């Protein structure tokens, strides 16, 4: 438990004896009692307590809206535009990668449909005993309506007794509407503070500006284009009240960037993972986790988090070393923090009763050139020898300047964190760990068609299977040209999750991708012979580099075996 870790590892000033701890708890209880007096005029009779009427009222009441208002109850809006209006909408998408033209026409106070498990409504909270939170929202050149809708959503769904403040951190925006106009608007709202960076900091350091100024016991980080579901805050704070070393994420519901439809789901949420490119991925909850749950609304352990929305004890955040300040833009920082939470004694969880809608932009609205360096820092500090699996699939990452990680490694040693093998074995056993045997991974190059390699680039990142494997000029950058020949005689395309294996369907001669199986089917087995011949076990035919008939490109096909160099293949780890 983290409590033991604090006594064993924290500085002397934080080591308290049993008497001091009891005194501290007594003071906390007295503080809660005084707050109860000042807010309600009555004194609770003492434990066991039940929530008092009215104690969960939000900071601001939500104003009534017409039932037919645009986007009411999270409904999709599809405007029929033409001429100048259509041009303005397209311009807003180009600038923000979100349909801001539509967002500006949807109320800042719209209600969302109920998208949580009905059991969540039955949960009772002891509001006087829950910690108060500071909600930190960093932004850079955000559109007016999406930013203000986020702020109002927090104020109109968060119990007043639980919300210490909302801290908006302006990361050196240069848009006119985010200057005096924003300051004037926010000055009229209760519990809202605006902090402005004096230079462009990037998401990580901007969030740290907010965290350092926060007065709440819990830090709740949100992105700047969110809408909070009713009852989103209480489950996060309740869980941290129960276990201070738990970092808790809400269920992230999608808000469509174009129609602003709220696509929440009351069913089982997904959890976070990653692939060996160190790209965050979503996954279904594994059976082992389901078996440990007593109720469908129990917290769900997650190997990683998306990173934009989570709550953490401020004290525990500081103990863990907060964010890695060597990181700037978003990307990679979420995996680094996820690894650190787990390896250093905490838990990372998703709470099914906490839902927050998030507008996922069409694509990133600004450059994230330093995201690769973030991933390299995460690999260097936390992944031990497994970082080589990342570098094999991202050769360019070896050349990426990533700064000094000496202090982060000292932090890992100070906190006596576990190794990455423990993380893979204990936290994420579902992730396949590649073998990467020398001479059997990298670019699979053809000997006859010189300079051409197997290449697979599915059009949909979320559906890796079902498309033909092709041949393109070797580029040496891994990714879509990285393959591994395993001891199970598979040719794995394992840069992404879920992993895919080259397959030949019965009666056909084209090589396509299908999901790898626990037991290797015959149509996924290939024999790589010493002379480089690649034989498909089921058909007994050889893989040959062949010109495609329709588009003059090249692709591998099954052909009767010959002595042709076009049927000989070899792995090459990097471009010479």
From Swiss-Prot:
Q: Read off the SUPFAM superfamilies from this record.
A: Nucleotide-diphospho-sugar transferases, Ricin B-like lectins
Q: Where is this region: Disordered?
A: 38-58
Its Enzyme Commission number?
2.4.1.41
Q: Which residues form the Ricin B-type lectin domain?
A: 440-572
Q: Which domain of life is it from?
A: Eukaryota
GO MF term (any one) = metal ion binding
Family annotation (PANTHER family):
N-ACETYLGALACTOSAMINYLTRANSFERASE, POLYPEPTIDE N-ACETYLGALACTOSAMINYLTRANSFERASE 12
Q: What does this protein do?
A: Catalyzes the initial reaction in O-linked oligosaccharide biosynthesis, the transfer of an N-acetyl-D-galactosamine residue to a serine or threonine residue on the protein receptor. Has activity toward non-glycosylated peptides such as Muc5AC, Muc1a and EA2, and no detectable activity with Muc2 and Muc7. Displays enzymatic activity toward the Gal-NAc-Muc5AC glycopeptide, but no detectable activity to mono-GalNAc-glycosylated Muc1a, Muc2, Muc7 and EA2. May play an important role in the initial step of mucin-type oligosaccharide biosynthesis in digestive organs.
Q: What is this protein called?
A: Polypeptide N-acetylgalactosaminyltransferase 12
